[in-house]
């Protein structure tokens, strides 16, 4: 299991975002995939930028958890699949008495997480753990809150992984799964070049790639993605589901536009042959900084997405 900062980034269970595209390829991609050789000095800032754009959603979700009448005092938090630690540090702010541990399989991202915690003044309650799940479940330690942001679906047996999380919870503790939601949209349906519906077709290609990734995971098992039922199956009490909206209308700020350009650049690379020649040509135009119809200049570029958080609680008895 690798990192997911936010992601970003669903036509199917997986959104077409750089976070997913990179993590899927890095951890599970076949040889020769252009995304398997990752420069974390390039990807790390992109992951941070994406998570920062979504920070308001994540903070709202964390405060929802903190305000639940059944919530125990949170003393230890595990952010599983933390990436560069944007959400980990946010959780440290929302739960000011808790130790927060960022868990990820990539040392370069954990170093970014640690540096971020230092900059934000939460390093005294912040730790990192390099771990690969499910092999390293026994190293995680117990927790009052386990945050799994778009990371569970990188484990072949999701039910067994949920049972593993349940076994780490202290009485009254909560698992927060960020899974599902709605696909990210950045362009109108008809952009005036190529066939209308470009992003929908990119989402379909991402869904195909996602299914291929899932099928190649060790111990992969198909599960109906009824998260409340899966919580109940592993002995947790479902505590509700909420979706949180990111809505940045046009015209975008410079940083948000830069992120859209960077994310679509990586999607163009990662989806590769799953796209038609016509759609690939349209993407080349969109990514050309000199093209007046491109992402660098279009007045209609926006950023709209919804992330869904599912909660399961361990009984206090």
Model-derived features with residue positions:
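Class I SAM-dependent methyltransferase Rossmann-like catalytic core
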Residues: 37-59
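A short acidic, Gly/Pro-enriched loop at the edge of an enzyme's catalytic core
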Residues: 137-145
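A short glycine-rich, Lys/Arg-flanked "PGG" loop and its adjoining helix->strand segment in the class I
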Residues: 160-171
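Class I SAM-dependent methyltransferase SAM/SAH-binding core
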Residues: 76-78, 86-136
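Conserved Class I S-adenosyl-L-methionine
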Residues: 4, 221, 225, 237-317
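A short SAM/SAH-binding and catalytic strip from SAM-dependent methyltransferases
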Residues: 144-159
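Conserved alpha-helix/loop element of class I SAM-dependent methyltransferases that forms part
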Residues: 55-73
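Conserved catalytic/acceptor-binding region of the Class I
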Residues: 176-252
């Amino acid at each position: 299991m690798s990192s997911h900062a936010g992601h970003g980034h669903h036509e199917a269970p997986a959104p077409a975002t750089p976070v997913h595209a990179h993590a899927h390829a890095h951890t599970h991609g076949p040889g020769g995939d252009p995304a398997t050789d990752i420069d974390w000095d390039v990807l790390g800032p992109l992951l941070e930028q994406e998570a920062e754009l979504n920070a308001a959603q994540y903070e709202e979700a964390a405060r929802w958890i903190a305000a639940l009448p059944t919530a125990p005092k949170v003393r230890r938090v595990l952010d599983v699949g933390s990436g560069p630690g944007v959400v980990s540090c946010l959780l440290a702010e929302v739960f000011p008495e808790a130790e927060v541990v960022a868990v990820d399989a990539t040392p370069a991202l954990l170093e970014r997480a640690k540096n971020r915690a230092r900059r934000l003044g939460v390093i005294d309650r912040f730790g990192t753990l390099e771990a690969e799940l499910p092999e390293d479940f026994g190293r995680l330690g117990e927790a009052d809150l386990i945050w799994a942001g778009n990371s569970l679906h990188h484990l072949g047996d999701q039910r067994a992984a949920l049972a593993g999380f349940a076994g780490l919870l202290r009485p009254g503790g909560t698992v927060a799964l960020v899974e599902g939601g709605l696909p990210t949209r950045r362009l109108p349906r008809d952009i005036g070049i190529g066939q209308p519906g470009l992003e929908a077709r990119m989402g379909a290609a991402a869904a195909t790639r996602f299914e291929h990734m899932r099928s190649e995971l060790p111990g992969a098992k198909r599960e109906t993605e009824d998260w409340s039922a899966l919580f109940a199956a592993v002995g947790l009490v479902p505590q509700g589901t909420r979706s949180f909206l990111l809505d940045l209308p046009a015209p975008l700020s410079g940083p948000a536009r830069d992120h859209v350009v960077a994310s679509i650049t990586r999607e163009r690379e990662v989806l590769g042959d799953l796209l038609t020649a016509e759609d690939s040509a349209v993407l080349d135009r969109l990514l050309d900084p000199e093209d007046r119809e491109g992402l660098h200049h279009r007045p209609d570029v926006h950023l709209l997405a919804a992330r869904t958080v599912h909660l399961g609680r361990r009984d206090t008895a």
